[in-house]
């Protein structure tokens, strides 16, 4: 009886370890080879989240972590680096003080930003991670966040 229980527990542990290894070593999604869900103007994307956050979240974001791949077009308002050394481009309407779209590049695609200057019109492909938000009580704004970005044009 004890050997049957021991064998059953061993089989369950082996299956669990196999599943964990499968999940751990599964290849990451290649955003640049994935077909884009839509091409959107940066200001239009921000306005969608500000007008109806729930509808925009349902359209662009996925609770399972497979958020949509978008191509965002807009005017470069700012170029910076984050704490990890990844370059970040803020796409924003120059005449608008509202939020914009923050596009974070990977270390592999950082070099694509070298020839881009503030004021340029660009198309950037990436995964949307968060929508624009405005907190009236604290007067705080949050840009739309696009990760794993790459310049298209």
Task: Kindly give the residue locations of the regions a language model identified.
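OB-fold and OB-like single-stranded nucleic-acid-recognition modules
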Residues: 2-153
